[in-house]
Structures are given as structure tokens and as C-alpha cells.
């Protein structure tokens, strides 16, 4: 095979988001920093979902973070496109922000994009999603956990198929993937391989086996984070940068290599 053709096939494999799935499963780790991205890869993650604002469920990361993450890891990096926390009903100006972020994410090397949008009555916003999917191409697209806020998840899954999404991230429309396990299984059964249904939300080493065995999923999404103490010696604990003192500036949440490895081993035992 010619070298150029080989490179093209490799790039297509990476862009599909399936690189790292050679073991029969794929673990996606959501991260919000370069350190966490590197740790996810070291632990055996097959793909990264790059976000900011994980306490809000994930928002669009800076392009600086994306650029350095792409320089630091080899596994695919899917970029969250979400202009703010809160609901998934977007104004015209917010849509313009999303479109601009998609263009920039592609420019800075994103391997895939992750987004979702709903109408006011809890249905997939077909018109908006279709235009965003077209803008994302040729990269693969994931519909994120906006799916868990839809009025009719079974109908919504079929809508995502017609719009061209390759996968959907879901907790089964419940507070966690474990709580939503019955619906996740129904969705995977309905999908019949036409779209990847990826469980996510509260997945840990304590429940991963049950979720994989109970759903039939071959991809899953987790954060696998631990708290790391700040290196600051001088500390003013009476000041918080956010709205609450509950989250200390002197405790940092980062992806834990050991946790990722443990989840990887559990998935191997179940699926390989």
C-alpha cells in the first residue's frame, strides 16, 4: 500500500472516533485540562471529550487548551460545543457562537465534535442540529446529554439517526447511568448498531460492570477524577472565585491514571 493511502486510512480511523477500540470496547474520558488529558491517555482511554466547566456539565473549552492537548496526546480528542451551562434552548446569538466554535475547533485539530440542542417542548431541534452537523463534517458528531432532557427518548434516537449523528451520550434520562440502565438497554436494543449509544453519568469502578453487562454497551463515558491538593503555600481560605465556598481553589479535580486503568481493566474483563 502506498504511504499516502495508509496515512489517509489511519486518519479516517482516528476521525471516526473508533481509534482505541481494538480491544472490543472504547472508554471515553471527559477532561477539562491538559494534565487530565495526558492522564486519561496514560490510563488507557481510547478517546477524550474535551470540555471546560465540568461542574456545569461541560462547556466549550478554550482553543488554547485544545491546541496544547492535541500536541500532548495521540488518542482522538472530541470537543464539546456548548456556549453556556443550563438548558439546551439556544438564542440566535448563541447559535452564532456555536458555529464559530465549531470552525475554530476544526482549525485547531479536533477529531470530533459534541453538541446538542432542543426545542422549547423538549424535542431535538432538527433544523439547528442539521446545520451544525453539516458544519462539523467531515468530522464525526456526538449528541451529548441534552438527550437526557428530551420528551420522548425513543423517538429522539430515531431523529438523531436521520440527522447523521454517529453516537449519543446518555444516562438513560436519569440522574446516573446506573439509575437509567433499563432505558439505556432499550435504546441500545432499538439502535441495532445504527448509532452508538454510550452510557455516561456517574460511572465508577463500583458500577461499570453492572452497566456494561446490563446494557450491552461497547463504549462508555466517565470522568475518573480525583482531588489533588494545590501547590500554593500561602492560602486565603475566606475567598472563593466562584459563587460558593463549597469548591476550594486549593483543591483541583484531575483525571486519575489509576482510576482510568481500573475502569479499563473492568471493561476488558466484561467485553473481551
Curated annotation (Swiss-Prot):
It holds the Pfam family CutC. May play a role in copper homeostasis. Can bind one Cu(1+) per subunit. InterPro entries: CutC-like, CutC-like_dom_sf. It comes from Mus musculus. Its main location: cytoplasm. Homotetramer. One of its GO terms (molecular function) is copper ion binding. PANTHER family: COPPER HOMEOSTASIS PROTEIN CUTC (PTHR12598), COPPER HOMEOSTASIS PROTEIN CUTC HOMOLOG (PTHR12598:SF0). This is Copper homeostasis protein cutC homolog. Keywords: Copper, Cytoplasm, Metal-binding, Nucleus. It is found in: Cytoplasm; Nucleus. Belongs to the CutC family. One of its GO terms (cellular component) is cytosol. GO terms for biological process: protein tetramerization.
Amino acid at each position: 500500500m502506498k504511504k499516502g493511502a495508509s496515512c489517509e486510512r489511519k486518519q479516517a480511523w482516528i476521525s471516526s472516533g473508533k481509534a482505541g477500540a481494538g480491544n472490543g470496547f472504547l472508554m471515553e474520558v471527559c477532561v477539562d485540562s491538559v494534565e487530565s488529558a495526558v492522564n486519561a491517555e496514560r490510563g488507557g482511554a481510547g478517546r477524550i471529550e474535551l470540555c471546560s466547566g465540568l461542574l456545569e456539565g461541560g462547556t466549550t473549552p478554550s482553543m488554547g487548551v485544545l491546541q496544547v492537548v492535541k500536541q500532548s496526546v495521540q488518542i482522538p480528542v472530541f470537543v464539546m460545543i456548548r456556549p453556556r451551562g443550563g438548558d439546551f434552548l439556544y438564542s440566535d446569538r448563541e447559535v452564532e457562537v456555536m458555529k464559530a466554535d465549531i470552525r475554530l475547533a476544526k482549525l485547531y485539530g479536533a477529531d470530533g465534535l459534541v453538541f446538542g440542542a432542543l426545542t422549547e417542548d423538549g424535542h431535538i431541534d432538527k433544523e439547528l442540529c442539521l446545520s451544525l452537523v453539516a458544519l462539523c463534517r467531515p468530522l464525526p458528531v456526538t449528541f451529548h446529554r441534552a438527550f437526557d432532557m428530551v420528551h420522548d427518548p425513543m423517538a429522539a434516537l430515531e431523529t438523531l439517526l436521520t440527522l447523521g449523528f454517529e453516537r449519543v451520550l446518555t444516562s438513560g434520562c436519569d440522574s446516573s447511568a446506573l439509575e437509567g440502565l433499563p432505558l439505556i438497554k432499550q435504546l441500545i436494543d432499538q439502535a441495532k448498531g445504527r448509532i452508538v449509544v454510550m452510557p455516561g453519568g456517574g460511572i465508577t469502578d463500583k458500577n461499570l460492570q453492572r452497566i456494561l453487562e446490563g446494557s450491552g454497551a461497547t463504549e462508555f463515558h466517565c470522568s475518573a477524577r480525583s482531588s489533588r491538593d494545590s501547590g500554593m503555600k500561602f492560602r486565603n481560605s475566606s475567598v472563593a472565585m466562584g459563587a460558593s465556598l463549597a469548591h476550594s481553589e486549593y483543591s483541583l479535580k484531575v483525571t486519575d491514571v489509576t482510576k482510568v486503568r481500573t475502569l479499563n481493566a473492568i471493561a476488558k474483563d466484561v467485553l473481551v
